[in-house]
């Protein structure tokens, strides 16, 4: 948000409250509660691991694509994208490499999210590699924390495409709410 505003772009409205649901399976109860209290709600999902039936139930509570339902894939033109795919692969890989220094990232495509023809986001590809090569669980939050620190320390390191993707996402969220 800070980086976008520092570059003259619109950030998220201060009226917006981000409420993690703990996964798509918990989405329906939260969305029902929000709509029952006449609060505007929007849902932002990755395109992977959405339990069957969740997307089908959302229209009954007036949340559907184009009306409150956003998918990361809409902002990177890549099916299965997650928030990590909004960043340039190089920037994300540098953070991953600092957390997992022995990880052979050369086995993962360095193409942009648009160029990758895979239906899983970059974090899922890295998780597979970590689990296969190192026999441990990929901890996305550790990479996310480092990513956040790097953005705060050196906001100029975010490339224009990343800024544009977040700007479009925030504009859409602001429009919905």
Where are these regions (language model features)?
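Activity-critical C-terminal alpha-helical subdomain
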Residues: 46-138
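Conserved helicase/translocase motor-coupling segment
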Residues: 1-59
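Generic structural signal for hydrophobic core residues of well-folded globular domains
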Residues: 3, 90-91, 95, 99-100, ...
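Terminal low-complexity/disordered tails
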Residues: 117-177
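Residues at structural and domain junctions
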Residues: 16-20, 69, 73, 112, ...
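Active-site-proximal structural scaffolding
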Residues: 27, 34-36, 76, 80, ...
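Residue-level recognition of the N-termini of beta-strands and the immediately preceding loop/turn
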Residues: 13-17, 67, 138, 142-143
């Amino acid at each position: 948000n800070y980086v976008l505003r520092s570059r003259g772009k619109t950030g998220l409205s201060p009226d917006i409250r981000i409420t993690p649901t703990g996964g798509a399976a918990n989405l329906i109860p939260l969305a029902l509660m929000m709509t029952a209290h006449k609060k505007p709600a929007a849902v932002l999902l990755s395109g992977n691991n959405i339990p069957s039936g969740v997307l089908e139930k959302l229209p009954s509570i007036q949340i559907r694509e184009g009306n409150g339902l956003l998918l990361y894939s809409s902002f990177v033109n890549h099916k299965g994208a997650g928030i990590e795919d909004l960043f340039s692969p190089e920037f994300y890989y540098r953070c991953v490499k600092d957390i997992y220094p022995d990880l052979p990232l050369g086995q993962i495509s360095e193409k942009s999210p648009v160029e990758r023809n895979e239906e899983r986001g970059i974090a899922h590809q890295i998780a597979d590699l970590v689990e296969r090569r190192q026999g441990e669980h990929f901890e996305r939050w550790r990479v996310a924390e480092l990513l956040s620190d790097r953005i705060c320390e050196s906001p100029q390191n975010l490339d224009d495409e990343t800024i544009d993707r977040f700007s479009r996402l925030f504009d859409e969220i602001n429009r919905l709410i």
